Amino acid sequence: MGGFVKTQKTNAYYKRFQVKFKRRRQGKTDYRARIRLTNQDKNKYNTPKYRFVVRFTNKDITAQIVYATIAGDIVMAAAYSHELPRYGLEVGLTNYAAAYCTGLLLARRVLKLRGLDQEYEGNIEATGEDYYVEPADERRPFRALLDVGLIRTTTGNRVFGALKGALDGGLDIPHSDKRFAGFKKDEKQLDSDIHRKYIYGGHVADYMRSMAEEEPEKFQAHFSEYLKKGIDADGMEALYKKVHAAIRADPTMAKSTKKEPATHKRYNLKKLTYEQRKASLVERLNALNSSAGADDDDEEEDDE
């Protein structure tokens, strides 16, 4: 029987070995997808492909409009779910409904930046149905491509909540309704009522009701932040409607108010002039001489 034979890598193997890109080695970037999202036709000059980038962390949602340059990616506009408390949504900043609000905020912000917010108001009342922006007579809608990164694009994923928010906000993003929450695979169509329920946080409200009945103690702990803010299951839809209206009223980014840094005391020694250094040296020499004279007097007293 032949045993395990270790593959011998020759000197030529190491000499010709080429490492992959750093972000591929770290598992952060899908370069196969990126090259298709950034490469532009060579007969189009200074016309970048804009990407609608959505990323999730444990406590935040980031949505950005990005375009690629040789020097690196440039972020044209960004919106974060931690901005939503300013619009009245203080809890549940990472769910499907919050993702919708973040996408809507980014869409209104970038259109205002480009002066298109009056021409393209988008879908003002979120019904859950699919929406495509219609081109106006003068200027075309702002077009971007969805960049999900390494997120698994399952049906009902939060990234498609952000996509729906951006579409209703007035952006032109190529898409299909097959991945929105509420799409029924058997019937091959989107159930707009289910999708509307997710947009307005109805799935969270249902969970609140069921947990309050079945496990009251767990409900008090799980939804403690909701209870502190006085948010209940029945008022969820009205809350999100107010948030959507507030976003449309003022999508601009608020400047953060930071305290001025405290002035620290400096402990650097002051640089002395030549005269000061000379005077200091004389003082030290006099002190040494006086101490040496005192020692001599003590020795004479001891001898006596």
UniProtKB/Swiss-Prot annotation:
Pfam families: Ribosomal_L18_c, Ribosomal_L5e. GO terms for biological process: ribosomal large subunit assembly; translation. Residues 294-304 have a biased composition (Acidic residues). Its main location: cytoplasm. It comes from the Eukaryota. GO terms for cellular component: cytosolic large ribosomal subunit; nucleus. It is found in: Cytoplasm; Nucleus. InterPro entries: Rbsml_uL18_euk, Ribosomal_uL18_C_euk. Keywords: Cytoplasm, Nucleus, Ribonucleoprotein, Ribosomal protein, RNA-binding, rRNA-binding. Residues 285-304 are annotated as: Disordered. One of its GO terms (molecular function) is 5S rRNA binding. The keyword Acetylation does not apply. PANTHER family: LARGE RIBOSOMAL SUBUNIT PROTEIN UL18, RIBOSOMAL PROTEIN L5-RELATED. Belongs to the universal ribosomal protein uL18 family. Component of the large ribosomal subunit (LSU). Component of the ribosome, a large ribonucleoprotein complex responsible for the synthesis of proteins in the cell. The small ribosomal subunit (SSU) binds messenger RNAs (mRNAs) and translates the encoded message by selecting cognate aminoacyl-transfer RNA (tRNA) molecules. The large subunit (LSU) contains the ribosomal catalytic site termed the peptidyl transferase center (PTC), which catalyzes the formation of peptide bonds, thereby polymerizing the amino acids delivered by tRNAs into a polypeptide chain. This is Large ribosomal subunit protein uL18. It comes from Oryza sativa subsp. indica. The lineage of its organism: Eukaryota, Viridiplantae, Streptophyta, Embryophyta, Tracheophyta. The gene is RPL5A.
